[in-house]
Design a protein with these regions (language model features):
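Alpha-helix N-cap/N′ positions at the starts of helices
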Residues: 7-8, 99, 152
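Inter-helical turn/loop segments and adjacent helix faces that build the functional surface
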Residues: 113, 178-182
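Amphipathic alpha-helical dimerization/coiled-coil segments
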Residues: 84-135
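Basic helix-turn-helix/winged-helix DNA-binding cores
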Residues: 1-95
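Intrinsically disordered, low-complexity terminal tails and inter-domain linkers enriched
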Residues: 146, 183-205
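Heptad-repeat amphipathic alpha-helical coiled-coil interaction surface used
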Residues: 116, 123, 130, 137, ...
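Acidic interhelical loop/turn segments
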Residues: 135-155, 184
Length: 208
């Protein structure tokens, strides 16, 4: 059976597939150390509204822990629903919404020092995010071998660490190019067509 669910609902179902029963708060905690790095970590209110929807559809079941707190587990139908969604719908191409790149595009409208400060701040933010994700990755050690419960989450964490490293390299390379342009008197902040993109090279592509 197929259900017309938002992607967030499928994401929450997926977080319940690791063999444990979670409260809404615990599900929020799990989302904060997983989904926030590559999707969106939903607010508590959204989590509870989605859990109510999923329970009404029979995709999750509630279990009273004896203390009056509801815990949630995925049902067989819920697990099959996630499998169907993954096998019968395309993942789609990710839409990149990059505020730093957007502002860099318009760098010719401000002074180079402002743009450089923005890039330096971004490098600092990347370092902080990488530290957070590295902690998550480390917590998966010992349970991340092929066939173990957290093998695929560890692959996602490694992907995220590589992404942060790549973004850091790109930002630092951009700052170097701006410094070189300033030293030779050229204007690297805008491309020859006025788009602000500059001329890319094969080496500018992010590496996995």
């Amino acid at each position: 059976m197929t259900h017309n669910l938002p992607v967030t609902a499928y994401a929450l179902l997926g977080l319940l597939t690791f063999g444990d029963e979670l409260t809404g708060y615990e599900l929020k905690q799990r989302a904060d150390v997983t989904l926030r790095f590559y999707w969106v970590s939903p607010a508590m209110s959204q989590i509870y509204s989605e859990l109510a929807r999923l329970a009404g559809l029979g995709l999750v079941a509630t279990v009273d822990d004896g203390g009056g707190t509801a815990r949630y587990r995925i049902t067989d139908e819920g697990r099959e629903t996630v499998r169907t969604w993954m096998s019968e719908t395309p993942a789609g191409f990710p839409v990149l919404k990059h505020p730093v790149a957007l502002r860099l595009l318009m760098g010719h409208l401000t002074d180079p020092a402002t743009t450089r400060a923005m890039l330096e701040e971004y490098v600092g933010d990347l370092a902080a995010a990488r530290r957070d994700l590295a902690g998550v990755r480390e917590s998966l050690r010992g349970r991340d071998a092929p066939g173990e419960a957290f093998h695929h989450p560890s692959l996602v964490a490694d992907w995220g660490l590589s992404y942060f490293d790549s973004e850091t390299r790109i930002a630092r390379r951009t700052m170097r190019r701006m410094a070189e342009a300033a030293s030779d008197g050229s204007d690297e902040s805008s491309g020859s067509d006025g788009s602000g993109a500059g001329s890319g090279t094969e080496g500018d592509a992010p590496r996995p």
